[in-house]
């Protein structure tokens, strides 16, 4: 599907605020509100917009501590639903380079992170040759 300039503008605005009213989107893009509505509906139907989600403040919901676990090995072949559905697992990405996976953990604090890491090593350690942990000190862009 080919996206034109107005589609890209709408998508950028919706990424910033998915609840922005059509009249604000119309004003920002210079197209009528009814056209905004039709374009958004088309983008949804074509799968460009997959879903709308709330961006939560991690501190407010008990996930003020964030860390990244860089993994070498092949645990992705053995990770199960328990892992992917764990409350602390925010993101998992297969990557190229020195590591095979990057796991983003968001949890209440250091103690909970250490407990999670210990459980991860116990359950998946035999599939992992190395982990490197980086604690997030500040989120610069969300």
Predicted regions and their residues:
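A compositional/biophysical signature of low hydrophobicity enriched in polar/charged and small residues
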Residues: 1-142
């Amino acid at each position: 599907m080919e996206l034109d300039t107005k589609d890209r503008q709408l998508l950028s605005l919706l990424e910033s605020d998915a609840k922005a009213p059509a009249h604000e989107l119309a004003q920002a893009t210079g197209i009528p509100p009814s056209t905004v509505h039709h374009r958004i509906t088309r983008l949804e139907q074509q799968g460009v917009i997959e879903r709308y989600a709330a961006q939560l403040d991690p501190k407010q919901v008990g996930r003020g501590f964030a860390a990244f676990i860089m993994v070498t090995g092949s645990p992705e072949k053995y990770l199960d639903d328990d892992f992917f559905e764990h409350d602390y697992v925010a993101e998992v990405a297969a990557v190229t380079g020195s590591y095979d996976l990057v796991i983003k953990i968001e949890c209440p604090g250091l103690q909970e992170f250490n407990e999670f890491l210990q459980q991860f090593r116990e359950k998946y350690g035999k599939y992992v040759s190395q982990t490197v942990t980086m604690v997030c000190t500040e989120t610069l862009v969300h």
